[in-house]
UniProtKB/Swiss-Prot annotation:
Binding locations of GTP: 21-28, 48-52, 67-70, 134-137, 167-169
BP term (GO), one: division septum assembly
Function: Necessary for normal cell division and for the maintenance of normal septation.
Cofactor(s) this protein cannot do without: Mg(2+)
Designated name of the protein: Probable GTP-binding protein EngB
InterPro entries: G_ENGB_dom, GTP-bd, GTP-bd_ribosome_bio_YsxC, P-loop_NTPase
Molecular function per GO: GTP binding; metal ion binding
PROSITE patterns linked to this entry: G_ENGB
GO cellular component: cytosol
Length: 211
């Protein structure tokens, strides 16, 4: 199910883990890799079509993955940005079934302003957070591990005890680790197929695909 605003979301019950990140962090690609559904989030040249809250039931309707609108909203009017940001804030603040975040950051540009805001907000709400440094295939192993260590050190300075890993949806780096995290929170395995209507899913922006 997809909803443009909090008031139209599925019933606020059960347990939800939301995927959040900038519009170019590879969020849709990560969800596709995790659920083994190549067309779950489809590419579009119209960024506005992805700015909805998308719910995916994992067999049990009370356990859901949630695909949140990417923040950053490049190349869209300012008034549209404000509307999207307001609805995203409403979900993050008021959604009682939201229990955790998977926060995606491009490994080449980690800990941007909005990322820091999301981390601080999640901490204030006592949510668990698992961070994916996406597009790790863009760096060699040494530089990628260096960024991972630097981000871990920054989180430690902020006194944020959040888990973090390298991830690439292109070569499936870190996929099993991510699935293990999901299994610890939801009844999820890589072989499990989520229940959803593909045709009901709004198309994703080009910026949300792996570059």
């Amino acid at each position: 199910m997809s909803a443009p605003k909090l008031a139209l979301c599925v019933e606020d019950s059960g347990y939800e883990i939301a995927f959040a990140g900038r519009s170019n962090a590879g969020k849709s690609s990560a969800i596709n890799a995790l659920t083994n559904q190549k067309q779950l989030a489809r590419a579009s040249k119209k960024p506005g079509r992805t700015q909805m809250i998308n719910f995916f039931s994992l067999g049990n309707p009370d356990q859901r993955l949630v695909d949140l609108p990417g923040y950053g909203y490049a190349a869209v009017p300012e008034d549209m940005k404000r509307v999207w940001q307001k609805e995203l804030e409403n979900y993050l603040i008021h959604r009682k079934s939201l229990q955790g975040l998977v926060l995606l950051m491009d490994i080449r540009h980690p800990l941007q302003h909005f990322d820091m805001m999301m981390l601080e907000w999640a901490y204030s709400r006592h949510l668990f957070v698992h961070i994916l440094l996406t597009k790790a295939d863009k760096l060699n192993r040494g530089p990628a591990n260096k960024v991972l260590l630097e981000v871990k050190q920054q989180l430690k300075k902020m006194k944020l005890d959040f888990s973090i890993q390298l991830f690439s949806s292109l070569n499936k780096l870190g996929l099993e680790e991510l699935a293990s995290v999901m299994a610890g929170r939801l009844h999820f395995t890589l072989e499990q197929q989520p229940e959803f209507d593909v045709d009901a899913i709004p198309e994703a922006s080009d910026e949300d695909a792996e570059e």
